[in-house]
């Protein structure tokens, strides 16, 4: 809350209703699909790479999930605060400072910072990939709204998954799918199809900011 208030008060993240006024509702549907389609493949990749959350992080995450304010913190406040800081402030400044030919460098730098602040490899790699997608959407729109929607969808899915299946954090994907790797691979393939379709749609629907 303090981060959101500070960045809004100091105008480090300019606030504008210009993007919302365009009523890009169907575009946001594809943003949600992009988030949902990326979650399972990224989890599969980190598991296959042998990366695990540190026990302290798992304990903290479980505590937040079971908290009365857990949904507010994870699904609402965290997406707004992180998008204001990393896309609305840091990436915005880098895009303004870099020549257009180097805009992807600005996105990579911001994504790397986004990964580093998570302070562990499992979340860090996931956050880096997510940061590339969020940065691309911000570069196209110069609005943090798509990023907030993406973040909201990703965190909301995780929140309700662990609420419905409290032991999910202690299981691998194979264990979660009944020790059947074929089922896991089919689920990952289906998720990648959703991800690919969403990325294709957003490439056309997110018009580059001129």
Please identify what each model-predicted range represents.
Residues 77, 109-113, 125, 129, ...:
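Hydrophobic residues within alpha-helical transmembrane segments
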Residues 12-84, 91-97, 172-176:
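Juxtamembrane helix-loop-helix connectors linking adjacent transmembrane helices
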Residues 1-11, 29-30, 184-187:
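Alpha-helical transmembrane segments in multi-pass membrane proteins
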Residues 28-33, 68, 72, 104-109, ...:
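Hydrophobic alpha-helical transmembrane segments
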Residues 81-109, 136-143:
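Membrane-interface helix/loop boundary segments of multi-pass membrane proteins
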Residues 152-210:
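C-terminal membrane module of polytopic membrane proteins
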Residues 116-122:
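Membrane-interface helix caps and helix-loop-helix hairpins in membrane proteins
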Residues 5-15, 137-141, 196-206:
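Structural signal for the C-terminal ends of transmembrane alpha-helices
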């Amino acid at each position: 809350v303090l981060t959101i208030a500070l960045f809004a008060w100091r105008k480090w993240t300019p606030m504008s209703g210009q993007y919302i006024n365009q009523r890009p509702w169907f575009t946001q549907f594809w943003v949600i699909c992009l988030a949902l389609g990326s979650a399972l493949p990224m989890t599969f990749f980190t598991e296959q790479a042998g990366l695990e959350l540190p026990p302290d992080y798992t304990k903290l995450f479980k505590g937040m999930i079971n908290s009365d304010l857990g949904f507010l913190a994870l699904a609402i406040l965290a997406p707004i605060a992180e998008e204001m800081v990393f896309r609305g402030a840091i990436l915005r400044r880098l895009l303004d400072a870099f020549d257009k030919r180097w805009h992807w460098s600005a996105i990579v730098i911001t994504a790397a910072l986004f990964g580093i602040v998570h302070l562990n490899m499992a979340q860090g790699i996931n956050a880096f990939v997510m940061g590339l997608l969020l940065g691309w959407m911000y570069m196209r729109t110069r609005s943090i709204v798509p990023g907030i929607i993406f973040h909201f969808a990703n965190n909301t899915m995780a929140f309700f998954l662990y609420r419905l299946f409290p032991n999910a954090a202690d299981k691998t994907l194979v264990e979660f799918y009944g020790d059947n790797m074929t089922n896991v691979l089919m689920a990952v393939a289906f998720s990648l199809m959703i991800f690919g379709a969403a990325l294709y749609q957003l490439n056309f629907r997110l018009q580059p900011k001129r």
